[in-house]
Amino acid sequence: MGSSHLLNKGLPLGIRPPIMNGPMHPRPLVALLDGRDCTVEMPILKDVATVAFCDAQSTQEIHEKVLNEAVGALMYHTITLTREDLEKFKALRIIVRIGSGFDNIDIKSAGDLGIAVCNVPAASVEETADSTMCHILNLYRRTTWLHQALREGTRVQSVEQIREVASGAARIRGETLGIIGLGRVGQAVALRAKTFGFNVFFYDPYLSDGIERALGLQRVSTLQDLLFHSDCVTLHCGLNEHNHHLINDFTIKQMRQGAFLVNTARGGLVDEKALAQALKEGRIRGAALDVHESEPFSFTQGPLKDAPNLICTPHAAWYSEQASIEMREEAAREIRRAITGRIPDSLKNCVNKDHLTAATHWASMDPGVVHPELNGGAYRYPQGVVSVAPAGLPAAVEGIVPSAMSLSHAHPAVAHPPHAPSPGQTIKPEADRDHPSDQL
């Protein structure tokens, strides 16, 4: 076997060495890749790991020390990790996505490289479902446009003026809501929608029979049936190579004339060019999007900039202070389980277990022999003078922690394969769940 197929000291591809702990070894380094606040994570990890933040938007902005030595990574949705990116991390054993969606991580390549990928699937179910219902109600009752009219100084007093400014407002009772993907959020939306008087249909080819009876919903067997019967369509499935641009010009033409569309799942599910054209032509009466193909979203550019009857929010449907704290705590606990236990057996929400080619033990930590260490240092790229801030406070200058363990691995240069869109197929099942996971 050539050197290009080795990671370290003769270990085959996919096997990474155990993490050495104890008084003779530095503590493992854990990095928050795309954020700078570690105050929630540090109390959970401070006795077993050194915690640092990178505040990066790409791997080019991550300091070499993190790339060489970090064994654990925490991340949100603002950074993408392809195989090429993953190969830059020489000692990484686990990535935890702070949220449920993980389409910004190449989980198969991570598994090939011996890196476990985990998520936090349940923390923001209520928030996302509530936000979805807010968007649906807004489309039906035209609240945003009525508010905007008053802000612009429009005089609204007579019945004729009200009729003009509220044109398009509709009654909800008896309308049919079509849900694509009946995972945690999809079910929560269904229960809320029934309370408002919606007839609820859903399409989910990977969900076991019987859930529709338990929840009092109507199940359809094809996406075309759902689009044909729905007055409003809402998306709650994950994004994968099979359902990219699930909503496109072809599927939009299968929707009812004048239907509404809501997406709080993943931006790549909707072809925004096709949606913009459908809104301009009136084939879709209105749309509400919390997620977009290109984020951060701006009305000043892109195909949706001139689209009428459109509500957009900045990928915030998942957010509440309570949910944010809960998911960060659970993400830190998952990192702790990885450090103190065995990968992947000790992990609660590993999404690429089937792709991991091998699992190695992490040495158990003995708190009695671990000395207090500075945490919360900044690890962002510009090279230069280094410093670390104690007690989780941001460092005065960005830098590194000295005296950390150095591991060197050689990775094969493999290009990340592009995902080919296949609009006719929707959700792809994942090994760690019984129903489609919902995406944040």
From Swiss-Prot:
Locate the site labelled Cleavage. Answer: N375, G376, S387, V388, H409, A410
What cofactor is this protein dependent on? NAD(+)
Under InterPro entries, the record lists: CtBP, CTBP_dehydrogenase, D-isomer_2_OHA_DH_cat_dom, D-isomer_DH_CS, D-isomer_DH_CS1, D-isomer_DH_NAD-bd, NAD(P)-bd_dom_sf
- Record-listed E.C. numbers: 1.1.1.-
Q: Where is the composition biased (Basic and acidic residues)?
A: 429-440
Q: Give compartment(s).
A: Nucleus
Q: Does the keyword Oxidoreductase apply?
A: yes
Pfam families this protein is in?
Answer: 2-Hacid_dh (PF00389), 2-Hacid_dh_C (PF02826)
| Ligand binding (NAD(+)) | 100, 180-185, 204, 237-243, 264-266, 290, 315-318
Give the keywords, sorted: NAD, Nucleus, Oxidoreductase
User: Per the record, which residues fall in region Disordered?
Assistant: 409-440
Extract the GO molecular function terms from the UniProt entry.
Answer: DNA-binding transcription factor binding; NAD binding; oxidoreductase activity, acting on the CH-OH group of donors, NAD or NADP as acceptor; transcription coactivator activity; transcription coregulator binding; transcription corepressor activity
Keyword check for Disulfide bond, yes or no. Answer: no
Where are the annotated coiled coils located? none
Q: Which GO terms describe its biological process?
A: negative regulation of DNA-templated transcription; regulation of transcription by RNA polymerase II
- Active site per UniProt: R266, E295, H315 (proton donor)
Function in brief:
Corepressor targeting diverse transcription regulators. Has dehydrogenase activity.
The family line of this record is: Belongs to the D-isomer specific 2-hydroxyacid dehydrogenase family.
PANTHER family reported in the protein's UniProt record: C-TERMINAL-BINDING PROTEIN, C-TERMINAL-BINDING PROTEIN 1
Name the record gives this protein: C-terminal-binding protein 1
Q: What's the source species for this entry?
A: Xenopus laevis (African clawed frog)
The gene for this chain is: ctbp1
